[in-house]
Regions:
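Redox cofactor-anchoring modules in respiratory/redox and cofactor-processing assemblies
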Residues: 1-204
Length: 204
């Protein structure tokens, strides 16, 4: 039987430059055969922005399959695999994407209209040096309120992405609480998309 294949986009830092590749690969291929996972990688995003972050150690053990990824809070999802270098802040990267995801909604139900902006705001605060007391608790509370309650699964995917960042970058949360950040480079690494305010002429 011929193994099923899929298209995968991989993103990695190579000599200080972001390298993006698109490859066709069998489902079930080990992740470390698809993107180089050496010690300058601090975390791996599997499945895109509705997927989840993995620790480097976990990613080295896993394959491109939902059977492997889902128990760890990630998915094959959009077929995106990003190796985040240690030079960048995983919290800041995730917060930037969360702000965009909060705007990528139809605004038709409370979890998208109110919940995702509140989550993005709280995560942005946690990603700053010395966040105000209670911001992390507020973030977790909002995430719990939103999960499973949207008219679609956009809130669920967004919360999965953010919750995985809180697990994988827990040490960075502690650094930020003490007024420090381990990042040495501050330009954005994750691919971004523009987010504009919803207006009366929006497609809705």
């Amino acid at each position: 039987m011929i193994a099923s294949t899929g298209l995968l986009c991989t993103v990695r830092d190579t000599d200080g430059r972001v390298r993006v590749r698109v490859v066709e690969t069998p489902i079930g291929t080990q992740l470390d055969r698809l993107v180089k996972l050496d010690d300058d990688v601090q975390g791996v995003l599997a499945g895109g922005y509705h997927g989840g972050w993995l620790t480097l150690a976990a990613a080295r053990r896993m394959s491109l399959s939902n059977a492997d990824l889902r128990p760890a809070g990630a998915t094959v999802g959009a077929g995106v695999l990003v190796a985040l270098p240690v030079s960048h802040c995983g919290l800041a990267e995730t917060a930037q994407v969360a702000r965009s995801l909060a705007m990528e909604s139809a605004g038709q139900c409370g979890p998208c209209l109110n919940g995702l902006p509140a989550i993005a705001t709280a995560l942005s605060a946690v990603a700053e040096p010395r966040p105000a007391e209670g911001e992390l608790a507020s973030l977790r509370r909002w995430a719990g309120l939103v999960t499973g309650r949207g008219a679609c699964h956009h809130p669920d995917g967004t919360v999965r992405f953010i919750a995985s960042a809180l697990r994988v970058f827990a040490a960075e949360i502690a650094e930020h609480s003490a007024g420090r950040c381990a990042a040495t480079r501050h330009e954005r690494f994750l691919p971004q998309f523009p987010a504009a305010s919803l207006t009366e002429c929006d497609w809705r």
